A protein has these predicted regions:
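Hydrolase active-site cap/lid region
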Residues: 16-65, 122-125, 130-138
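Active-site nucleophile elbow and catalytic-triad environment of alpha/beta-hydrolase enzymes
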Residues: 34, 68-84
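Surface beta-strand/loop "capping" patches
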Residues: 135, 142-181
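Conserved alpha/beta-hydrolase "acid-adjacent" motif
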Residues: 101-107, 131-132
């Protein structure tokens, strides 16, 4: 059995490998918050009113213009992790940065409800696409440790509705909860 993790394009590879290799017992895709690619990138463009400078290479090669074409749809059928979403039955820890230059901090809404349990989502405060420091890796190591030692992972259920964030916790477990929030209605944080 294997645990896999990777950041950015290697995170995409973690998603696709977990879909097809039954030896994967858990995985952690990092800073690749683009499952369900088309609505995610449409949201990206609509939110900014343009493409982020981080994706300029893709714009320069007209890749963004491929969206909506038959060829692009055929490509997504093969390489888009969201196409395989029902296969992700392993425990997974998705880690993203709140100021990722490529992906918006609310891109989870295009796939999270469809992703099978057991699933965990972490956003690193002030974390860019490189997630500088050890914050993310410590959590991956802890997640992996719990999996290989068959230890329970604290489970919480959360929901965002009407601008409120609701969390339901198991009262029999100890928790430490830290809140990080940005109050700006602008998308330039």
């Amino acid at each position: 059995k294997f645990f896999i993790a990777g950041a950015s394009k290697r995170g995409w590879t973690a998603w696709t490998t977990a879909a097809v290799d039954n030896r994967i017992m858990g995985f952690s895709p990092v800073v690749i918050d683009v499952l369900n690619t088309v609505p995610s990138f449409q949201h990206h463009y609509k939110s900014y009113g343009a493409w982020s400078p981080a994706v300029q290479d893709y714009v320069d090669f007209d890749i963004m213009d491929w969206m909506g074409t038959k060829e692009f749809e055929k490509l997504l059928d093969i390489v888009e992790p969201y196409e395989f979403i029902k296969l992700y039955k392993q425990p997974k820890l998705v880690i993203n940065g709140t100021i990722d230059e490529f992906f918006l901090p609310d891109s989870w809404k295009f796939y999270w409800k469809d992703l099978p349990e057991e699933k965990y989502l972490q956003y690193v405060p002030n974390g860019n696409h490189g997630l500088k420091g050890s914050y993310a890796t410590r959590n991956i190591f802890s997640f992996y440790y719990h999996l290989i030692n068959d230890l329970p992972i604290p489970k919480l259920e959360w929901e965002i509705a009407d601008k409120f964030f609701e969390i339901n916790l198991n009262p029999n477990l100890d928790y430490e909860i830290n809140l990080w929030k940005a109050n700006s209605s602008k998308r330039d944080f």
